[in-house]
Amino acid sequence: MNQYNFILDASAFEKGLGNVKRWCQSNGNVDGKKNVYLRFYVPTFTLQELNFLQYRHKSFSAKEALKFIDKLETATSEGQRNHVVIGRKKEEDLRSDLELFIEFPDILDAVTWPTVLSYCTEGQATIDSLNKLPKRFKILLKSCVYKCHLEDDDRIRWILVTEDPQVRKIASQCHIPWCSIVDADSIISKDMNDRSFRDSEKFNSMMLKRGVAKSENMDGKEVIKTNFDQTVYATRGSGKLWTP
């Protein structure tokens, strides 16, 4: 069984809440096998940032993310994994191979800022720029350094999931591994063999069959050329297209 241990920042919840909800569903794997064990870590930064977005910017996605985190925490801590409202209306069973950790504020006091800077090896200029960061980003770095570098468990490797370019930059400067929601979703969907992965594989196979030429771009990625008359569209759900 593959294990994935994700530190989720505010942008991961705000822009990828639907993905996170799907990961938590017990019926994500069509053959019923447990191929994935998930651990989610929610830093203090994430909760504070989502609260700020909810009240100052009236962000609906931030509000929904906070509600979901609260439901998830209650369900995982009390063992009430049946009939958790993952979507807006539909009740789902929460997967049993899922752990949620909400950060204790005391952890931030245990990690000093000089400790965080000790993991930056890019020179004094980078350290100076880190020293000028807003407090909220320093708090996030403390959380990530603790989970990725200081926690006494070599068996677990934590990865920060973020959609924020600035967070990605400062994470790299402190040697904190990170990935995007799309990257995380692609890996988990493949392991769970869920519908989104199967549809993607089906579409890619169709493109390969109908392609007339293959080449590589400057980044080394494969490019498939097709005839205009044989345009392949992504699969869509059944139903009538809505028109105003």
Swiss-Prot record:
Name used for this protein in its record: Nonsense-mediated decay protein 4
One GO term of the biological process aspect: nuclear-transcribed mRNA catabolic process, nonsense-mediated decay
Keyword field: Cytoplasm, Nonsense-mediated mRNA decay
Organism: Candida glabrata (strain ATCC 2001 / BCRC 20586 / JCM 3761 / NBRC 0622 / NRRL Y-65 / CBS 138)
Compartments reported by the entry: Cytoplasm
Function field: Involved in nonsense-mediated decay of mRNAs containing premature stop codons.
Gene Ontology cellular-component terms listed: cytoplasm
Highest taxon listed in the record's lineage: Eukaryota
Primary localisation category: cytoplasm
